[in-house]
Amino acid sequence: MALTLLALLSVLAVQETHPAPASPPQGTGVVIREADTVVRQPPPHRGEGMSTAYRISDGVPNRAMEFRKRALHPGASIGLHPIAHDEVYYVVSGQGVVTSDGVETAVKAGDAAYLYDGNVVGVRQTGEADLVLIIAYPLAQRKD
């Protein structure tokens, strides 16, 4: 009995100092309320102007991807930056220009810009209304 208890305590001590990698939650997953994710901030990557960020996936435990919504207010832009993964910018509303490796393409509601690993990308709002985007990309691979 004492040996069994000692073995159990040893296992618990090892688990305490070297926890197993987290697993995704079981069941329905995680539901995020958009209203809980809103942050008014300057756009990333040295962009100009002001934006509203909806950092939707930030609170998801052990996530493998980033999923965000961003409203670029009139005159705002996400600055040019290199990407180390594929990214998708889906236009929910408004108008803008997406730049990928120096090529500028006008986008509007319903358009999706698929941007490739290694590209230098950015986006700017044009027109009178906010440019509202859904942005999705993978995070670094988990080592489970």
Protein language model features and the residues they cover:
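Bacterial N-terminal signal peptides
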Residues: 2-13
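A short, N-terminal "cap"/entry segment at the start of jelly-roll beta-barrel domains
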Residues: 12-64, 143-144
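Ligand-binding loop in jelly-roll beta-barrel domains
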Residues: 61, 117-142
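Conserved short histidine dyad/triad with adjacent acidic residue
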Residues: 66-83
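Glycine- and acidic-residue-biased ligand/ion/polar-headgroup-sensing regions
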Residues: 84-96, 101
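Short acidic-glycine-tyrosine-enriched beta hairpin
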Residues: 103-118
